[in-house]
Amino acid sequence: MLNFELITTDGNARRGRVTLNHGVVETPIFMPVGTYGSVKAMSPLELNEIGAEIILGNTFHLWLRPGLDVVNTHEGLHRFIGWDKPILTDSGGFQVFSLGDLRKITEDGVTFASPVNGDKLFLSPEISMQIQRTLNSDIVMQFDECTPYEIEGRPATHEEAAKSMRMSLRWAKRSRDEFERLANPNALFGIVQGGMFEDLRDESLAGLSELDFHGFAIGGLSVGEPKEDMMRVLEHVAPRLPADKPHYLMGVGTPEDLVAGVAAGVDMFDCVMPTRNARNGWLFTRYGDVKIRNAAHRNDPRPLDESCACYTCRNFSRAYLHHLHRVGEILGARLNTIHNLHYYLQLMREVRESIEQHRFSDFRRQFASDRARGTR
């Protein structure tokens, strides 16, 4: 089940509300990534406290470990991981295609060697839908071929991108058919592919639109292409997506990318950046980024961001976070992650408010000015 309400718009920016089987999601929204059923360094309680409304799980990795039998014992992923709000799962396609020479693609699906134990495995649109039905994720993603930016060290040609995109379209139909055969009560999103070519993106969207998905994602971006190419494709595709369905930009990105995505008409985002960077001591603030490992923070009594209300900023100094990072304490990764995810979620709250008040353009200018100012 999915119900999408478009509350208001401001230019191409959209303020919406998505109702799913496990709850309501206010959009634009950022979705923390929980690859193995866990958002790294965060408990479900902490995710609730910072205002997370929906998280991601990874179909490919959860299929391999712990395995569907374990998840099925818990009647789905929600009970297994102790999270009662919505979950989106990807199809496993991106991970399979990231295996490179370890996999073989045919019309039927993909054969590959398990990265866990080397076993020969097979994943297809039908199997992906079956796995995601067992996971009982609120939003299921179609099985697709993520068109790489580079093939053999050079940008993918129009012909290569077209072949990949049309395979994904055929797999989209099979995903939709299997989703319906399983009588899955959740929502299914199609994924627009086509590489860096606008005409192929248009062809992909036209084909997906005939299948009447519950929502539409933009895939195949942030896969190594120059930022200007990413923005060109994003700004072409996002405004053309069906206005009455949620729009999801997969795997993107920086705070600046999120705001640019909203301006283009995107409603949903995910990225490992805030959690991965947190563990590496790279922290996002209203006034630019802080590399907490740098010696400049060794004796700094200030919080990371004096405008931030997260647990980390309310209770700890830059000096303490610097110390934790330098000595490798687990608490450092946890406090850093709490802050970075809070920052991303608070950014989306401010974006939503600015769209509601029809001042998103002003917000965007102030956001860019603040981030460019840098921390002091």
Curated annotation (Swiss-Prot):
Enzyme category, top tier: transferase
Catalytic site: 90, 270
Pathway(s) this gene product operates in, as recorded in its UniProt entry: tRNA modification; tRNA-queuosine biosynthesis
Catalysed reactions listed for this entry: 7-aminomethyl-7-carbaguanine + guanosine(34) in tRNA = 7-aminomethyl-7-carbaguanosine(34) in tRNA + guanine
Spans annotated as RNA binding: 251-257, 275-279
Cofactor(s) needed for function: Zn(2+)
A GO BP annotation: queuosine biosynthetic process
Annotated residues for binding of substrate: 90-94, 144, 193, 220
The protein, known as: Queuine tRNA-ribosyltransferase
